[in-house]
Amino acid sequence: MTNTGTDVEAGDRQGAETAQAAPRRLSPLAIVIMVIVLALLGVLGLQLIEANRSQPTGGPAPDFTLQIFDALGGGTFTLSENRGKVIVINFWASWCAPCRDEAPALQQVWEAYRARGDVVLLGVDYVDNTQDALAYIAEFGITYPNGPDLGTRISDAYHIQGVPETFVIGKDGNVFQFIYAGVTARDLAAIIDRALAQ
């Protein structure tokens, strides 16, 4: 049988398709380099995230005045007027599931420290409507001062990334501790006790 040009072209095409279908293998060195590059990118990404989480974690706490809900006595609370006390500022919202989980713990801590007079627990309602906020306060039997963060002035000053977030302000007016998630009564009480001891 003689070989025609058509048979050669068909064979060449089949060989070319086979060559294209065969996966290319990476050398072990290339794999190691890729792993190192990905690890470095991960570390850099985490550092960027931490750098952008710029909540105050020390130094003077941003001052503010909060209008307290009428259902909790009304009036205002100004941070700078309460120097000499440990102030626990909890940012929350009625639509926040983790906030609902920690609400009983916050009330428990307030009941434990309220009579001392040198500890204040303050709730700052974040991006919420008054009706839902008041229903939340009633549902959890909250008695410590709470008010709406009108125009997100306070949460902006504290660079809130989400809720719940809690700041413990020392007697000197500086941020003593920042808590980036829900908190238990036991953990919060331990932080307050350390702040009181300073």
Where are these regions (language model features)?
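N-terminal targeting signals for export/organelle localization
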Residues: 1-67, 198
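Short loop/turn microsegments at loop-to-beta-strand junctions
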Residues: 62, 87, 163-164
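Conserved hydrophobic/aromatic "anchor" residues
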Residues: 64, 77, 91-92, 136, ...
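A short beta-strand-turn-helix
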Residues: 65-87, 110-113
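Short active-site neighborhood of thiol/selenol oxidoreductases, capturing the structured segment around
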Residues: 77-100, 121
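Soluble periplasmic/extracytoplasmic beta-strand elements of cell-envelope proteins
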Residues: 87-90, 121-125, 167, 178-179
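Structural microenvironment flanking redox-active thiols in thiol-disulfide oxidoreductases
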Residues: 100-140, 150-157, 190
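Thiol/disulfide oxidoreductase modules built on the thioredoxin-like
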Residues: 135-143, 148-197
